[in-house]
């Protein structure tokens, strides 16, 4: 593979001998800025029933709805050493992955599964040995089914205690080598998808036409969001009181944030856009930065929105050392005058009072190249939420092609957008491509991949192969490849095709 990278670099030097005014390289980023790529436990590990692991709510949803599963997926559980070698070849600074709660503590509380513990120790050791920073997510859609059956999982505040005990094990066992912890992955979309819409784990809702056996879309969405914040605050407090002085790490919270723009120039749509930002951004950033929910949400949702006690408010406020952002595309916002609800009862969308429409032609799968949407998100966070440290924890586009030129163009543009935001004052400290390799996706399953590396899921050995984007990213991270303009990318596509 190194030989290919060398040839690829020589090719680029002939294809793009000049530099344009907006071309820049890795060296333009601040010292210590992390470039990486990501996966998550259920999407990458496989080995779903091996070595003591028990089902999570993600396993259960997949089997109950017959929508494919992550039983084997990439088989990262057995192939992690091979994958770390690929990370070295790609020149990653960091690798973002999650820990499976149901592998480490299969029943959600109580005894630790020693084989699961050893797997994560081995993975982290392999990363550290090869100079790759572990960036660990503690919860990624997959709490143990045992806790869901026992008391309803996140709809019950008993989850806060069990989550805190689980992360205590993680901090104790891995914290000497892990400096970056994200407690919850994309908390807003996890909550909306899992408890309002019922489309993602654990699949609870009360909307008609949905395949939900349990749930209440009017209340559970907000109860779960509240419990996630309290669980994060509890984990953060534990880390800072017990581990931070010795381990020196930081603890953050993850959100899925779109670039939101009014669909028209009307005042109503402008107001609706700000309301949508309060519901998507402020729902969690408000408590984390200021200690409470936005007034917009409190007025609209009323008694269905839980209330922080004074003590809870103080615990949540300032509990996040950084904000993790998952960002893929933009959306337009249209005001809803009469707040219709499918069920006749209020839910997240009717409460928000806005239609949010994704921008782009999604019939072609890949996402549009629109880096200004990420710039707008980072600027809004800077202006509205005291400019906290930020890591872009997911950014990428799905594609089916091996010669994924559009992904190269997308990554090039969005990384450039991050640099522009930094130059404009955003405290953004890292960028992670989603994903390092093709995975079992939350929505697309195995229909298309986001990976820098393709995975042959029909091959029992799950062969990995570098896409064009892997070579491009590797050369950029080595400082050999400067950013390409659109003309150069088209030439790259043509020349790469002719040389394949």
Swiss-Prot record:
Span of the signal peptide: 1-20
Q: Where is the active site?
A: 186, 394
EC?
Answer: 3.2.1.21
- Top enzyme class, one word, equals hydrolase
Positions binding a beta-D-glucoside in this chain are 43, 140, 185-186, 328, 394, 434, 450
GO biological processes:
carbohydrate metabolic process
**SS bond list:** 205-212
Segments traversing the membrane: none
Q: What keywords is this UniProt entry annotated with?
A: Disulfide bond, Glycoprotein, Glycosidase, Hydrolase, Signal
Q: Does the keyword RNA-binding apply?
A: no
UniProt-annotated glycosylation sites, renumbered to this chain: 216, 361, 424, 456, 495
Describe the reaction catalysed, as an equation: Hydrolysis of terminal, non-reducing beta-D-glucosyl residues with release of beta-D-glucose
> Annotated Gene Ontology MF terms?
beta-glucosidase activity
Query: In terms of domain of life, where is this protein from?
Result: Eukaryota
Family designation: Belongs to the glycosyl hydrolase 1 family.
What PANTHER family does the entry give? BETA-GLUCOSIDASE 1-RELATED, GLYCOSYL HYDROLASE
UniProt protein name: Putative beta-glucosidase 5
- Origin species, per record, is Arabidopsis thaliana (Mouse-ear cress)
């Amino acid at each position: 593979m190194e030989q290919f990278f060398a040839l690829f670099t020589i090719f680029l030097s002939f294809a793009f001998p000049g530099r344009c005014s907006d071309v820049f390289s890795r060296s333009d980023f601040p010292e210590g800025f992390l470039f990486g790529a990501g996966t998550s436990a259920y999407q990458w590990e496989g080995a779903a029933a091996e070595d003591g692991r028990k089902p999570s709510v993600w396993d259960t949803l997949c089997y109950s709805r017959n929508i494919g599963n992550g039983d084997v997926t990439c088989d990262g559980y057995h192939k992690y050493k091979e994958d770390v070698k690929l990370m070295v070849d790609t020149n990653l600074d960091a690798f973002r992955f999650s820990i499976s709660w149901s592998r480490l503590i299969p029943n959600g509380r109580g005894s630790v599964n020693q084989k699961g513990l050893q797997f994560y120790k081995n993975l982290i050791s392999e990363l550290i040995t090869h100079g790759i920073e572990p960036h660990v997510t503690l919860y990624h859609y997959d709490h143990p089914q045992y806790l869901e059956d026992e008391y309803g999982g996140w709809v019950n505040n008993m989850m806060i205690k069990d989550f805190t005990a689980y992360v205590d094990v993680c901090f104790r066992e891995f914290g000497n080598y892990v400096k970056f912890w994200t407690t919850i992955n994309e908390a807003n979309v996890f909550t909306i998808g899992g408890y309002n819409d019922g489309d993602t784990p654990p699949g609870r809702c009360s909307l008609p036409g949905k395949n939900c056996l349990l749930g209440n879309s009017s209340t559970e969405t907000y109860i779960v969001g509240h419990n996630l914040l309290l669980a994060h605050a509890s984990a953060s407090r534990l880390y800072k009181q017990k581990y931070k002085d010795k381990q020196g790490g930081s603890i953050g919270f993850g959100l899925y944030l779109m670039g939101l723009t009014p669909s028209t120039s009307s005042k109503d749509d402008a107001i609706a856009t700000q309301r949508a930002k309060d519901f998507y951004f402020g729902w969690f950033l408000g408590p984390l930065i200021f200690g409470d929910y936005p007034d917009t949400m409190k007025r609209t949702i009323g008694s269905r929105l839980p209330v922080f006690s004074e003590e809870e408010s103080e615990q949540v406020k300032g509990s996040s050392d950084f904000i993790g952002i998952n960002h893929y595309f933009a959306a337009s916002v249209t005001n809803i005058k009469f707040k219709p609800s499918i069920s006749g009862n209020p839910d997240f969308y009717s409460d928000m009072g806005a239609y949010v429409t994704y921008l782009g032609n999604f019939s072609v799968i890949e996402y549009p190249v629109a880096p200004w949407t990420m710039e707008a998100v980072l600027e809004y966070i800077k202006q509205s939420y005291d400019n906290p440290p930020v890591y872009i924890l997911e950014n990428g586009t799905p594609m089916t092609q091996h010669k994924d030129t559009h992904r190269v163009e997308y990554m090039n543009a969005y990384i450039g957008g991050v640099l522009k935001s930094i130059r404009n004052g955003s405290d953004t400290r890292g960028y992670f491509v989603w994903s390092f390799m093709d995975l079992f996706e939350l929505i697309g399953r195995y229909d298309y991949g986001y990976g820098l590396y393709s995975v042959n899921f029909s091959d029992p050995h799950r062969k990995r192969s570098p896409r064009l984007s892997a070579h491009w990213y590797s050369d950029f991270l080595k400082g050999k490849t400067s950013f390409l303009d659109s003309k150069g990318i088209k030439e790259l596509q043509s020349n790469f095709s002719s040389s394949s």
